[in-house]
Design a protein with these regions (language model features):
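Patatin-like phospholipase
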Residues: 1-20, 28-190
Length: 190
């Protein structure tokens, strides 16, 4: 957000945005027309602890569940799947994360990303093939979620039969994606 503030201060035009991971979140919010002040309010009100938490805040738990805090280290998804033991796909499923991402997206519903106020692309990684997946359309919140799914921490996002994780694995700085969008000058932020 800080870089965007400086670009606005010096009136540097932003013709397109390509983002990965946290860059996909900030990029999508800005590309969809959210002002930096609006972003600051939403991002400032987010507790990182709650963002990546799957259970309600402690004060909302019954006394019995509160005592579990002292006896249970974590509660991963464990179960049987076709007779085989299966484990969760990440420490968190990303449900809370998706809620916040929907707040950060001014564009609701399905979009061609070239039709946003600023053309936008997000990069995720196909967990099966190991290749980059560049999103040119979709629901912004879902696309941001896929691009931010850190393997092992947040469960992969499922899209069109693919399991997608954080784009940083294949395109930490999606400069080539920005060039393919027509950018002559690229300002890359890591």
């Amino acid at each position: 957000v800080g870089v965007l503030k400086v670009l606005e201060e010096y009136r540097v035009p932003v013709d397109c945005i390509a983002g990965t991971s946290m860059g996909s979140l900030v990029g999508a919010a800005y590309a969809s027309g959210m002002t930096l002040d609006e972003m600051d309010v939403i991002l400032g009100s987010i507790s990182t602890e709650l963002l990546f938490r799957e259970t309600p805040p402690r004060q909302e738990l019954a006394l019995r569940r509160k005592t579990d805090d002292y006896t249970i280290l974590s509660t991963p998804e464990v179960g049987l799947d076709n007779g085989s033991l299966s484990f969760g796909k990440g420490i968190v499923t990303g449900v809370q994360l998706e809620t916040v991402l929907r707040q950060l997206s001014k564009a609701k519903g399905f979009y061609e990303f070239d039709e946003l106020p600023i053309p936008y692309r997000a990069v995720a990684t196909d967990l099966v093939t190991g290749k980059a997946v560049v999103f040119k359309e979709g629901e912004l919140a879902n696309v941001m979620r896929a691009s931010m799914s850190v393997p092992g921490a947040v469960a992969p996002a499922e899209f069109d039969g693919m399991l997608l994780v954080d784009g940083m694995l294949t395109s930490n700085l999606p400069v080539q994606t920005a060039r393919e969008m027509g950018a002559d000058v690229v300002i890359a932020v890591n």
